[in-house]
Amino acid sequence: MIVIKYGGNALPDHNTSDPVLEAIADAFLDGEQIVLVHGGGPQIDAALEEKGLGKNKVAGYRVTDEEVFNVVQSVLSGQVLRSIVNYLIGSEVNAVGLSASDGGLIRARKFKPTVDGKSVDIGYVGEVDEINPMILETLMTEGFLPVISPVATDNDGVGFNINADLVAAAVGGALRADSVIFLTDVDGIYRAWPDKSSLISEISIDELKQIAPSFVDGMSPKVKAAISAIDSGAFSVRIANGTDLASVLDALDNQGGTLVSA
């Protein structure tokens, strides 16, 4: 079974085809068990800009007060989640939409980044504290494809937005997935980005951990998520270009991109 992190850069509907979701639907209908975790950065940015919110950032992290969080939650667990689920249902897939806290799936805790050696409170931004995959196992056994938005609550019922890559990693680990596929906007992990000749086709988790500190900017979060997925129980991770249909099809067929093996 596979867990897929889908960026959701464009909201799908059946007036316009979404080749990535069509490929995922085809794989599911061919018998593959799939869990899909989605992001929604562009939609969140657009919604916040419309309201004049979310402009404050600390060390690259958006400061998420209650008003900002309410917009984020509405976009992720409403607009984006429903759009993806509706599209998959229109492709004859038994898709079910969940927030990351539904059915006791994930318990969150507040995430506080370290800035200049000090822990900083940036509001309703969380990380995975606990995970119980029973709801996903039940749904998959009954023939459903779960679609998860990365919004979860803590033990007091307080909601948090969690990085979708880390949600996918936690889900893949808890389910002991054969593969966790991170669909991104580059062809895989590069040793020396932006040198495209430095693309890594395959690497062990041990070697990736050794070179992990050398990664910066956009590559670092994917590397951290890949390590987290395998450390928590997934058998492999593949990072592939979600903007290129051929790359997506290859990834679903256990090829291409960067393979990280346990």
What are these regions (language model features)?
Residues 2-262:
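C-terminal catalytic "cap/lid" subdomain
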